[in-house]
Amino acid sequence: MTCPNNQAGNSFFVDSLINVRPDSGSYYQSNGVYLPPGSEFSYGLSGGSCFPGIGKRNEPSAQSVISSPAPYVQGMETWLEASRPCRVDQPRGQHMAQCSFSPNIKEESTYCLYESDKCPKGATVDDISYSASSCPVTSTFPVPGYFRLSQTYASSRHYHDAHPNTDHFTLQQSARPDSRSSHRQAASAEPEQRANREESPVCAPCVPVREEDSRLSSEGSSSPEPAETPSLECPEKSGKGDGKNETAANWLTAKSGRKKRCPYTKHQTLELEKEFLFNMYLTRERRLEISRSVHLTDRQVKIWFQNRRMKLKKMTRENRIRELSNSFSFS
């Protein structure tokens, strides 16, 4: 701890405190302060000094706070307030040294390397806090520490040049509006092409049943869910009547509003449902006959009946639980 305010008072105060003997008390006539020996009090003088933070000048300063004086040392307190030989408190004007870290970051975001009319990209790259007034009008450049690659990557070779070539920038400015206009024309042409495609829709030919069967057999074997819902047909088949279109929409829409998986057509599902009403379990011969009649493979018919039996079991379980919950009130 250094005492910069009063050097004469500092030397007298420190030397007088260092010369105090720990075994006997000391008395200062000028101030009327009596310092008892260290043996009487445990919190008294340690090592012959009044404060633990004050030592010899050659020793390193100890980082400790000055404790408040005892009630019998009131004269010492007034003596410290009068001359102020060693004070830890700083004047109110110097609260805290201003940190230079955050202003540097702020200046970095607001620096403009070139003039505003020569660097049109600076406005898009800069932060929201960027203002036109912060951009210098002169051709002088700031310290290289504020050099930003994002602003001057394309024209970095003009950084060391005192007079950059203005023709390069004017050519770039004249070329940019042309490119923007071409982009706008291309963007306006895309909706027209989409509208033309919507006006003349081409109906994709229906996939042959055999190819669809080979594709759906793998799906049916991997999914245990019931798959009796029909798939979308061609517009020629589905466009026979408005009532049939509404029923097809009901078939294709699940309770949650999503589209169902439709590996089977409506005709195939109806035939399989009729057979399931007569017999839940099929023999191999009957399964082969049904597969030929509905144009499905033997494996697809087998998987459909398995899924339909699981669905029936689930529905009966839910109905039983609903009946029990209605008969017994759990309130």
UniProtKB/Swiss-Prot annotation:
PROSITE patterns listed in its UniProt record: HOMEOBOX_1, HOMEOBOX_2
InterPro entries in the cross-refs: HD (IPR001356), HD_metazoa (IPR020479), Homeobox_CS (IPR017970), Homeodomain-like_sf (IPR009057), HXA10/ABDB-like (IPR046333)
S-S bridge residues: none
SMART domains (UniProt xref): HOX
Cellular component per GO, a single term: nucleus
Function noted in UniProt: Sequence-specific transcription factor which is part of a developmental regulatory system that provides cells with specific positional identities on the anterior-posterior axis.
Membrane spanning stretches: none
Subcellular location: Nucleus
Compositional bias of kind Low complexity: 217-233
Organism, as annotated: Takifugu rubripes (Japanese pufferfish)
Annotated protein name in UniProt: Homeobox protein Hox-A10b
Keyword NADP in record: no
DNA-binding region: 257-316
Entry keyword 4Fe-4S: no
Primary gene name: hoxa10b
Domain of life: Eukaryota
Biased composition (Basic and acidic residues): 191-200, 234-245
CDD domains the UniProt entry points to: homeodomain
Keyword annotations from UniProtKB, A to Z: Developmental protein, DNA-binding, Homeobox, Nucleus, Transcription, Transcription regulation
Residue spans of biased composition, Polar residues class: 167-176
Family matches, as PANTHER family: HOMEOBOX PROTEIN ABDOMINAL-B (PTHR45874), HOMEOBOX PROTEIN HOX-A10 (PTHR45874:SF1)
Major place of residence: nucleus
Family: Belongs to the Abd-B homeobox family.
Region (Disordered): 158-251
GO molecular function terms noted in the UniProt entry: DNA-binding transcription factor activity, RNA polymerase II-specific; RNA polymerase II cis-regulatory region sequence-specific DNA binding
